[in-house]
A protein has these predicted regions:
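Generic beta-sheet signal
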Residues: 2, 136-148
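Active-site-proximal alpha-helix that buttresses catalytic centers in soluble enzyme cores
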Residues: 9-68
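Phosphate-handling substructures
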Residues: 25, 67-126
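Extreme N-terminal starter segment of soluble prokaryotic enzymes
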Residues: 1-3, 48
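Short, active-site-adjacent cap segments at secondary-structure transitions
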Residues: 11, 56-58, 81-82, 148-150
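Domain-level recognition of soluble alpha/beta enzyme cores
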Residues: 159-181
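Short glycine-rich phosphate-binding loop at a beta-alpha junction
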Residues: 46-53, 74, 139-143
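Active-site signature of alpha/beta-hydrolase-fold catalytic machinery across serine-
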Residues: 63, 151, 155
Length: 186
């Protein structure tokens, strides 16, 4: 079983800012969310815990790892959020009003050909490579980012999340049966 988790809340999440690959820390709320998630996950055995190397995901994974004897968190750059260059740090309101290409990127990133440091197809390739390397006989927690998780589910595994993935939400993925379960911890 693979458990896919979005990092806890950051100050930029609260301000409605695009983070991308900016290394933004968790807020107090995000730390508390991670602690609450750790308690909800404490009875699930994880053989391994992987995380994006960005601090907001890594700190979330570290908090979870305190309840699990896995030997620590394994950072993997392939789990990073998409790099969006000059859009990073700007509010979503600003982007919608002042960056006409942002709407195309947001709604159809696979069609966007603009100037960003990382193309959508490259994100999918690195995610696909990561998941193909996992030992699918193990129970694994993966902590990553909203855009990455959404498109991992949608475009690699053909599962369309109906609503955005919340901070510290965990999605359970049964690799053998290719099924997903949201809100299984609530």
């Amino acid at each position: 079983m693979i458990y896919i988790m979005r990092h806890g809340t950051t100050p930029y999440n609260k301000e409605g800012r695009l983070q991308g690959q900016m290394d933004i820390p968790l807020s107090e709320e995000g730390i508390n969310q991670a602690k609450e998630a750790a308690l909800r996950l404490k009875d699930i055995h994880f053989d391994e815990i992987y995380s994006s190397d960005l601090m907001r995901a890594h700190k979330t994974a570290e908090i979870i790892a305190r309840f699990h004897d896995t030997g620590g968190v394994i950072n993997d750059r392939r789990l990073r959020e998409i790099g969006l260059g000059t859009w990073e740090g700007k509010t979503y309101d600003y982007l919608r009003k002042n960056e006409p290409d942002y709407a195309l990127f947001y709604n159809s990133p696979q069609l966007y050909k603009g100037d960003v440091p990382e193309k959508y197809i490259d994100v999918l390739k690195r995610l696909n490579d990561f998941f193909n390397e996992l030992d699918h006989e193990k129970d694994i927690l993966v902590v990553s980012h909203g855009f990455v998780i959404y498109h991992l589910l949608k475009d690699i595994h053909n599962y369309e999340p109906i609503v955005p993935i919340d901070n510290c939400e965990v999605i359970k993925y049964d690799y053998k049966n290719n099924t997903f379960e949201r809100n299984f911890m609530r």
